[in-house]
Swiss-Prot record:
Alphabetized Gene3D superfamilies for the sequence: 3.40.47.10
Species of provenance: Lactococcus lactis subsp. cremoris (strain SK11)
Assembly with partners or alone: Homodimer.
Protein's name in the database: Beta-ketoacyl-[acyl-carrier-protein] synthase III
Purpose: Catalyzes the condensation reaction of fatty acid synthesis by the addition to an acyl acceptor of two carbons from malonyl-ACP. Catalyzes the first condensation reaction which initiates fatty acid synthesis and may therefore play a role in governing the total rate of fatty acid production. Possesses both acetoacetyl-ACP synthase and acetyl transacylase activities. Its substrate specificity determines the biosynthesis of branched-chain and/or straight-chain of fatty acids.
The UniProt record lists the keyword Ligase: no
Any single Gene Ontology cellular-component annotation: cytoplasm
MF terms (GO), sorted A to Z: 3-oxoacyl-[acyl-carrier-protein] synthase activity; beta-ketoacyl-acyl-carrier-protein synthase III activity
Keywords: Acyltransferase, Cytoplasm, Fatty acid biosynthesis, Fatty acid metabolism, Lipid biosynthesis, Lipid metabolism, Multifunctional enzyme, Transferase
UniProt EC number: 2.3.1.180
Entry domain remark: The last Arg residue of the ACP-binding site is essential for the weak association between ACP/AcpP and FabH.
Region (ACP-binding): 251-255
Pathway noted in the entry: Lipid metabolism; fatty acid biosynthesis
Recorded family membership: Belongs to the thiolase-like superfamily. FabH family.
């Protein structure tokens, strides 16, 4: 059998750091108010780089660190809800910039669950035997869709990108078990870049494209539905919650992670966290955490670590993959 394996991980964030104190100068907020409610201290905000620029820097790191000829890359998937444009896709822009001339490339839109959904897809592409090597990236520049006058959302988000290189060299399944979910009926609780009908033949007025969020509804969704998804995936894997080495969850809010750890009966320090430095980077949050963990020696990519990856957010979407890293 053919098994996919993650062989490289990389991340990139803009140099410009915006602290809670910086935000207090442009809106009615302060460090204590933000940190006590979210666990966020800083976020990196782009001053000129677009989503494809961030993603390209990640892809170049993955290729350079692996020594792989970019022409041997079979596919590139970029998970994002803040693309440079709808056409061409962010992934197509990355493909051109890194010289992956033989790769097919496309964007996947699943908000904060995007990286987990994309990794699941990539694993199937490789384990099918049809493709040997691919790149999966989560990349966001949320600063371009935020309403900077709305303190309820502006304090939460940051910009960044991260990803992994996969190939067919695995000696065991990459994904032990998974469960992906969507509930479009609740999709209106988190909206961004809404594109209304605008033609000479329609009388519909244009509505703004800034991000809007029903904070309480999203918080309740995260603490009620997501732990059930993780538990169901654990049951499919025949693993107990404490048998997992680390939990890498979407970095939305430290209080959400506190509640999830308690509901699952898992030691809180198994839930890795870096939102204090990056804020909520949507599809980029899980791979940034993964890449940082490898860089900092928390775990390596030797196939010996069992990790839960869980994303949750707009769509509504949520999903878990238990993987051998």
């Amino acid at each position: 059998m053919t098994f996919a394996k993650i062989t490289q991980a990389a991340h990139y964030v803009p140099e410009n750091v915006v602290s809670n104190d910086d935000l207090s100068k442009i809106m009615d907020t302060n460090d204590e108010w933000i940190y006590s409610r979210t666990g966020i201290k800083n976020r990196h905000i782009s001053t000129g780089e677009n989503t494809s620029d961030l993603a390209t820097k990640v892809a170049k790191q993955l290729i350079e660190n692996s020594g792989v000829d970019p022409e041997l890359i079979d596919f590139i998937i970029v998970a994002t809800v803040t693309p440079d444009s709808m056409m061409p896709s962010t992934a197509a822009r990355v493909q051109a910039q890194v010289g992956a001339t033989n790769a097919f490339a496309y964007d996947l839109t699943a908000a904060c669950s995007g990286f987990v959904f994309a990794l699941s897809t990539a694993e199937k592409l490789i384990s099918s035997g049809a493709y040997q090597r691919g790149i999966v990236i989560g990349a966001e520049v949320f600063s371009k869709v935020i309403d900077w006058s709305d303190r309820s959302t502006a304090v939460l988000f940051g910009d960044g990108a991260a990803g992994v290189l996969l190939d067919n060299s695995g000696s065991q399944p990459l994904i032990i078990a998974e469960k992906m979910q969507t509930d479009g009926k609740r999709g209106g609780s988190l909206l961004s870049s809404y594109a209304d009908i605008q033609t000479p033949f329609a009388s519909v007025s244009y509505e703004g494209s800034n991000l809007s969020m029903e904070g309480r509804a999203i918080f309740d969704f995260a603490v009620r539905d997501v732990p059930k998804n993780i538990q169901a995936t654990l049951e499919k894997s025949d693993l107990a919650a404490e048998e997992i080495d680390y939990y890498l969850l979407h970095q939305a809010n430290s209080r959400i992670l506190d509640k999830m750890a308690k509901k699952l009966g898992v030691t809180r320090n198994k839930f890795l966290q870096n939102m204090q430095e990056y804020g909520n980077t949507s599809a980029a949050s899980i791979p940034i955490l993964l890449s940082e963990s490898v860089k900092n020696g928390i775990f390596s990519l030797d196939g010996q670590t069992k990790v839960v990856l869980t994303g949750f957010g707009g769509g509504l979407t949520w999903g878990t993959a238990i993987i051998n890293l």
